[in-house]
UniProtKB/Swiss-Prot annotation:
Any Gene Ontology biological process: protein quality control for misfolded or incompletely synthesized proteins
Main location class: plastid
SUPFAM superfamilies in UniProt: ClpP/crotonase
Keywords: Chloroplast, Hydrolase, Plastid, Protease, Serine protease
Database matches in PROSITE patterns: CLP_PROTEASE_HIS (PS00382), CLP_PROTEASE_SER (PS00381)
Listed EC numbers: 3.4.21.92
Matching PANTHER family: ATP-DEPENDENT CLP PROTEASE PROTEOLYTIC SUBUNIT (PTHR10381), CHLOROPLASTIC ATP-DEPENDENT CLP PROTEASE PROTEOLYTIC SUBUNIT 1 (PTHR10381:SF15)
Keyword Chloroplast: yes
Protein name: ATP-dependent Clp protease proteolytic subunit
Pfam family, one: CLP_protease
Top-rank taxon, per record: Eukaryota
GO CC annotation terms, alphabetical: chloroplast stroma; endopeptidase Clp complex
Length: 205
């Protein structure tokens, strides 16, 4: 029998008694966001909405985005990445397990030098794929042009956020490139490998 999302007590300022809210709701109130599934429209919209709300609530207080994401849809992922750049608060990104495909794209979007990977984390980068497998030739042609534009944008972001030369990014996005946490740090995808818990805690104060 599934356990479901645990509930925890929470007392809002001014309330005498605590109410029970689900775990993620409680964590969101502490500006701790979680991307722990494939990126789709629903999860991207939820996270973007939370980022806008938290930015309006306190533009000077950091947001922490914990990532364990195997990939997902390109357009919602690009939208989430752009929202991270648009809001005022710094967004710290923390890779807890895997950041693959669009998950790695969100990981690089964190505020530098506040992109963290846990020691066991794994990162994978590759190019965005088309969503058309069937359909008319016109659909395929239009989608191909769109994918090319998105690929160019993603390539530019990887170049800017990692410091790698364009030829390196172009080459690596043409295949699946897997990295350990330390390899991702050397590549420029993350800034810190939190091998020492004190390093990790410093970012979560």
């Amino acid at each position: 029998m599934p356990v479901g999302v645990p509930k925890v007590p929470f007392r809002a300022p001014g309330d005498e008694d605590a109410t029970w809210v689900d775990l993620y709701n409680r964590l969101y109130r502490e500006r701790l966001l979680f991307l722990a599934q494939d990126i789709n429209n629903e999860i991207a919209n939820q996270l973007m909405g939370l980022m806008v709300y938290l930015s309006a609530e306190d533009a000077n207080k950091e947001i922490f985005s914990f990532i364990n994401c195997p990939g997902g849809s390109v357009i919602p992922g690009v939208g989430l990445y752009r929202m991270m750049q648009a809001i005022v608060p710094d967004v710290n990104t923390i890779c807890m397990g895997v950041a693959a495909s669009m998950g790695s794209f969100i990981l690089i979007g964190g505020e530098m030098p506040k992109r963290i990977a846990l020691p066991h984390a794994r990162v994978m980068i590759h190019q965005p794929a088309s969503s058309y497998y069937d359909g008319s030739a016109a659909d395929f042609h239009n989608e191909s042009k769109h994918v090319t534009l998105v690929r160019e944008y993603i390539t530019e972001c990887y170049i800017e956020r990692t410091g790698q030369p364009e030829e390196v990014i172009q080459r690596d996005l043409n295949r699946d490139v897997f990295m350990s946490a330390t390899e991702a740090q050397a590549y420029g995808i993350v800034d810190v490998v939190a091998e020492d818990p004190l390093i990790f805690n410093r970012f979560l104060k």
